[in-house]
Amino acid sequence: MSSCACNTGIKIIYSCSGAADVGELADRAVRQLRKEGIAQGSCIAAIGADLSGYVQSAKGADMTIAIDGCPVGCTKLNLEKIGVTPVAINLADLGFKKGESAFSESLLASAVDGIKRVLSGDKAETAVNVNTSGSGCGCGGNC
């Protein structure tokens, strides 16, 4: 007998890990948020490589969060490519500038705080995308 994970509140967070300073900042912020239990982490490169287990996990999550370092938005674009519309947070929108955000613990704390504010709804432009298929398992609500 299979067990459905519908409506279990599964949140998965993905990050940019680009070569730019803001990519490193996004990656480290996501690692910190994961440690704090904000969401489970997963691999955006596996999404880009179309690895089925990773794709199904992203599609089945109740909330998918994309943290990008710069306006290119690779994390968000990779998720959209597989049909997932994530809660998208771009560090550029939080005031971090590419080429001017060399990693430091204080910048990390600011990035983590900004991401938490957006996720909690403190920023008006936040559009939280919750899976509306009726479930979090990707079955379409038929279980």
Functional labels for PLM-detected ranges:
Residues 1-140:
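Iron-sulfur-associated redox domains of electron-transfer enzymes in respiratory
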